[in-house]
């Protein structure tokens, strides 16, 4: 276990004007280049959820897969992949949503979940909440329930966490950034 003074934000690189002017992109690749940082992040989520009552972990394409798979492995939970449109080979459920950059579609295999399942949905970052709201809608369409939405980073000024909570989805993030914070 690491001390409370571990500086997670130091491992999240701000990239100005990416993918478009005026945006500060939060690049988590330095986190994956730090064994200590990656262990810290994984341990924080594992400690939070080790005794939680859910059946599956749903990870968002693509950066959500990276930590989501570690958490699923450590907690011995099935991992459900929520992919961008056209990436899954079998029958899918699809949900459209708005991102901070435009419109997109999220898909999940139609047979991934069923009544009685409870899913922790995971992504690297909550901005507008569009991706995780689409995932929550897909989970509910299968008859399953959303346990919680979790992410490494929250951008509270974009109100994604608020939108998720208003839709009945509790949220948890390890850290947050203001839109102007470097």
Swiss-Prot record:
Asked if the Swiss-Prot or TrEMBL record annotates the protein with the keyword tRNA-binding, the reply is no
Q: Which InterPro entries match?
A: Ade_phspho_trans, Adenine_PRTase, PRibTrfase_dom, PRTase-like
Any single GO molecular-function term of the entry would be:
adenine phosphoribosyltransferase activity
Keyword Transferase, does the record have it? yes
Keyword terms = Cytoplasm, Glycosyltransferase, Purine salvage, Transferase
Q: Which Pfam families match?
A: Pribosyltran
Query: What does the record give as the reaction this protein catalyses?
Result: AMP + diphosphate = 5-phospho-alpha-D-ribose 1-diphosphate + adenine
Can you tell me where the transmembrane regions are? none
As recorded in UniProt, its EC number(s) are 2.4.2.7
| SUPFAM superfamilies per UniProt | PRTase-like
Gene Ontology terms: cellular component: cytosol
Q: Name its pathway.
A: Purine metabolism; AMP biosynthesis via salvage pathway; AMP from adenine: step 1/1
**Localisation per UniProt entry:** Cytoplasm
A Gene Ontology annotation in the biological process aspect, one of them, is: purine ribonucleoside salvage
Which HAMAP family does this chain map to?
Answer: Aden_phosphoribosyltr
The Swiss-Prot or TrEMBL record describes its family as follows: Belongs to the purine/pyrimidine phosphoribosyltransferase family.
PANTHER family noted in UniProt: ADENINE PHOSPHORIBOSYLTRANSFERASE, PHOSPHORIBOSYLTRANSFERASE DOMAIN-CONTAINING PROTEIN
What's this protein's function? Answer: Catalyzes a salvage reaction resulting in the formation of AMP, that is energically less costly than de novo synthesis.
**Assembly:** Homodimer.
List the protein's name: Adenine phosphoribosyltransferase
Give the species this sequence originates from.
Pseudomonas entomophila (strain L48)
């Amino acid at each position: 276990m690491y001390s409370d003074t571990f500086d997670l934000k130091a491992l999240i690189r701000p990239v100005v004007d990416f993918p478009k002017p005026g945006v500060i992109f939060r690049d988590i690749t330095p986190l994956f280049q730090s064994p200590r940082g990656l262990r810290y992040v994984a341990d924080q989520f594992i400690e939070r959820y080790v005794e939680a009552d859910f059946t599956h972990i749903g990870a968002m394409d693509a950066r959500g897969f990276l930590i989501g798979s570690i958490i699923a492995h450590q907690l011995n939970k099935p991992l459900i992949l929520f992919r961008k449109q056209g990436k899954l080979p079998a029958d899918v459920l699809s949900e459209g949503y708005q991102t901070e950059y435009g419109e997109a579609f999220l898909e999940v295999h139609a047979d991934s979940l069923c009544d009685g399942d409870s899913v922790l949905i995971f992504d690297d970052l909550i901005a507008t909440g569009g991706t995780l709201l689409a995932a929550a809608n897909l989970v509910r369409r299968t008859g399953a329930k959303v346990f919680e939405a979790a992410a490494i980073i929250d951008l509270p000024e974009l109100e994604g966490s608020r939108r998720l909570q208003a839709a009945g989805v509790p949220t948890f993030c390890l850290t947050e950034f203001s839109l102007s914070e470097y």
